[in-house]
Each structure stands twice: as structure tokens, then as C-alpha cells.
């Protein structure tokens, strides 16, 4: 069974130590609930990932583990076959011992867009909400973060993350916990909190912003990326049914409306640092994710619209600061 004991040890003397009052019981319950089903099968695959300590690790410019020179052709083919068991791979890309995991998303492009606008992550304790398989967590570590914690309830994402971590080395201070943000107590401890590609999946976006605020220390930085539409501060799209074939999209505000939401949640120093239309080159089907992707979600006669007739995906990134506690928004 996937163990979280090393995470408990790493936070025992940190600003997150009070989390240990509740977290082991929550994750213990998760472990009991996942004794059967797909997780034990995937764990057998993870237990086969015994490979040499990588000769190189680059987390600054990419997520690259091993030069490819340490494994013979047959060993590399065996490793690739093991990693393919965890398909579909959605967020990346990763390079592992000469194997290029070409994921659906070019998550490195998003990172390059937002990185210049972040407060330096060096020596920071960071939370990534809805972290997927953890690509951006490794890039945060590459920027010098002291601790990186990701939360995502997907068992597949957890196993993909564990596969990369076992190949990179378990000593790295980066951990994925199979939790949703609603399972976190108000920790008031993280220096930086990321929420990227999550807000539009939440039935109550203001509550999500308050949950993010409650994880930050006073003066901590929020990095929020979500789908937006054009319009003024009163413009919010609520899809009648599906958006881009997704049935779990609830609210798409304009950038101006989202700024008001952040103010309502008592954030200050709010800045929209990037607005970008998702391109067919950034999100696409690949050999590692052979299912439908963005091109299938757009109107075949007009790529500016989804198949439902809504504006095509456009993403905005906001950076904001947690204000001094001076009013009750709960």
C-alpha cells in the first residue's frame, strides 16, 4: 500500500505540523477504502520500478530524470511498458531514462507563462490544489521550494506521480495526497498556493477561493488559473449542460468578474498576469493519451466555439495576496 509516512516525518518540525492532528486518520481511511479495485494492481506495477539512481535530474528547465545512458535497450523498453500501464497521461511532459512521455497537455508552456510573475519559490512551502500527476510540483521544486504538497483525489494521478517519484528518488520533498481541498482544515501555513484548472469545476467558486485563502499564511501568495470569457465585471457564463463536452463546468467569469470575486474573498494586490487562448498544439491527443482532446471539443467549422456553441477555452492567471485577518467571510 502506498505509504505517507515519509510525508508525516517531513512536516513534523514544520509549519504544517498541526496537520498531523487529523491527516493520518483521513489518509488511513483512504487506504482502507482502496484495498480493493485498481489500486492494488497499479501498486504491483509501482513495485517493479527498481532502477538505478538517475545520473542526472533536471527540474529547472524540464522534468527530466536520467540521461538514457544507464539502461540497456531492453531495460528501457520494459520501463516504458510499465509506465504505459498508467495511461492516459494528461499533464507533463516527462523524460525518464530516455523515454519521452508525451502527455496530452504541454504543461511546461503554462509554467513558462506564469513563472516570471511568481514571487520566488526558493525556501517556500507550497500547496498545489488539483495537481494532477504532479508535473508543476516538480517544477516548483526545481525553483527551490522547501516543501511541495499536491492534493488531487484521482488514484490514477497518484500512481503516475508515485511512478515518477520512485524513479527520481523518494528523498525529494514533494508529496501528493489523494484528497480534495474540502478535506483540508484551515492550515494558514503555506507561503504559496496554486489552483490551476480547478475553479470552473467547483459548484461554489467563492467557497473555493475562501478555502484557498484558509491554506495561506497572512501575506502568502495565491496563483489562480481558470477558464474565463470576455466581458465586464457582471459577465459570468453558466453552461446550460456541457462545456467542451465536460459536464462538470459550473461558472466561467470574465477576468473583471473574477477580480471582484477575489476582492470579495479578501485578497489584495490582485493582478491578472496572463490571458491565453488554449491552442490545439498545447492540448492534443498523443501516443500516451490517445483519447479525445481539445480538437474534438471545438466546433469543426469554427474553432472559436465549443461544440455546444460557447466561446472556446480561454485561460486567465491571477496572482493575489492573502490580506490581514480583519473580517469574517465565513
Curated annotation (Swiss-Prot):
Keywords: Transferase, tRNA processing. Gene3D superfamilies: Vaccinia Virus protein VP39. Coiled coil: none annotated. GO terms for biological process: tRNA wobble uridine modification. Carboxy-S-adenosyl-L-methionine binds at residues 91, 105, 110, 130, 152-154, 181-182, 196, 200, 315. Transmembrane segments: none annotated. Its EC number is 2.5.1.-. GO terms for molecular function: methyltransferase activity; transferase activity, transferring alkyl or aryl (other than methyl) groups. The keyword Glycoprotein does not apply. It catalyses: carboxy-S-adenosyl-L-methionine + 5-hydroxyuridine(34) in tRNA = 5-carboxymethoxyuridine(34) in tRNA + S-adenosyl-L-homocysteine + H(+). Pfam families: Methyltransf_9. Belongs to the class I-like SAM-binding methyltransferase superfamily. CmoB family. Catalyzes carboxymethyl transfer from carboxy-S-adenosyl-L-methionine (Cx-SAM) to 5-hydroxyuridine (ho5U) to form 5-carboxymethoxyuridine (cmo5U) at position 34 in tRNAs. Homotetramer. This is tRNA U34 carboxymethyltransferase. The gene is cmoB.
